[in-house]
C-alpha cells in the first residue's frame, strides 16, 4: 500500500462501538461503511472479552484488506500485532507511542488523541505519530466528558505537517465546518452507525461528498 502516510487518505474515518455495532451486526455494518467509501476504520470495543475481540478484529482486518482500507485497533497494540492490523489509535492515557512503535514497527499507522492541545500534538509529532486527532467538537455520546475543541485548532494544526482528524459528535449535518477548517478525516461513530444498518452506506457517501466539495486532495475515484 505504499508509505505509511500514503495509506491515510482524506475522507470518512469509521469507528466502531460495541453498543452500536455488536458482534451480530459488526461485519455487515463496517462492510456498508466501506462500500460507502470509508477511508480508514478503527475497531473500538470496550465491552467484549479478549477472545471475542480477537475473533472480531481478525474478521474486520480481512474485510478491510478486501477494500484496501487500513484497520486500526483502539488502544491495543498487542491485538493489532496479533491480527496484522495496519496500526493503532492511542489516547493520552493508553500505551505509549514509543512502546507501540517498538511492537508494531515503522510501517504501522499510529494515531494520537490530542484533545484541543497543540502542545500534545507537537509532542506526538516529535514522537513519530502518523496522524493527529482533535476533539470533541460537538456533544458526544461516546466520550461525553471529553474537553471541547474549537475548529480553529484544526487550522493551526495543519502547520505540524501530519494528517488531521476531527472527532466528537460529528454527523452529516455538522461535518462541513470541520473539513473547511482543515480536517483531513472526520472520525464518526454514532453519526455513521447510530441509525439503521441499511442507512450506513448512504451516510458514508454523504460524508465523502462533503470532502469532495471542500477538501483539495479528496477524490471520489480513489
Curated annotation (Swiss-Prot):
Pathway(s) of this molecule: Cofactor biosynthesis; thiamine diphosphate biosynthesis; thiamine phosphate from 4-amino-2-methyl-5-diphosphomethylpyrimidine and 4-methyl-5-(2-phosphoethyl)-thiazole: step 1/1
Chain coiled-coil ranges: none
Gene3D superfamilies recorded: Aldolase class I (3.20.20.70)
Binding site for 4-amino-2-methyl-5-(diphosphooxymethyl)pyrimidine: 42-46, 74, 113, 143
HAMAP family: TMP_synthase
Cofactor(s) recorded in Swiss-Prot or TrEMBL: Mg(2+)
Function of the molecule: Condenses 4-methyl-5-(beta-hydroxyethyl)thiazole monophosphate (THZ-P) and 2-methyl-4-amino-5-hydroxymethyl pyrimidine pyrophosphate (HMP-PP) to form thiamine monophosphate (TMP).
Keywords: Magnesium, Metal-binding, Thiamine biosynthesis, Transferase
Signal peptide span: none
Cofactor binding description: Binds 1 Mg(2+) ion per subunit.
Residues that hold 2-[(2R,5Z)-2-carboxy-4-methylthiazol-5(2H)-ylidene]ethyl phosphate according to the record: 140-142, 169
InterPro entries (alphabetical): Aldolase_TIM, ThiamineP_synth_sf, ThiamineP_synth_TenI, TMP_synthase
Matches recorded under Pfam families: TMP-TENI
Positions bound to Mg(2+): 75, 94
GO cellular component: cytoplasm
Name of the protein described by the UniProt record: Thiamine-phosphate synthase
Native source species: Marinobacter nauticus (strain ATCC 700491 / DSM 11845 / VT8) (Marinobacter aquaeolei)
Broad class of enzyme this protein falls into: transferase
GO molecular function, a single term: magnesium ion binding
GO BP terms: thiamine biosynthetic process; thiamine diphosphate biosynthetic process
EC number(s) stated in the UniProt entry for this protein: 2.5.1.3
Gene designation per UniProt: thiE
Reaction(s) this enzyme catalyzes, per UniProt: 2-[(2R,5Z)-2-carboxy-4-methylthiazol-5(2H)-ylidene]ethyl phosphate + 4-amino-2-methyl-5-(diphosphooxymethyl)pyrimidine + 2 H(+) = thiamine phosphate + CO2 + diphosphate; 2-(2-carboxy-4-methylthiazol-5-yl)ethyl phosphate + 4-amino-2-methyl-5-(diphosphooxymethyl)pyrimidine + 2 H(+) = thiamine phosphate + CO2 + diphosphate; 4-methyl-5-(2-phosphooxyethyl)-thiazole + 4-amino-2-methyl-5-(diphosphooxymethyl)pyrimidine + H(+) = thiamine phosphate + diphosphate
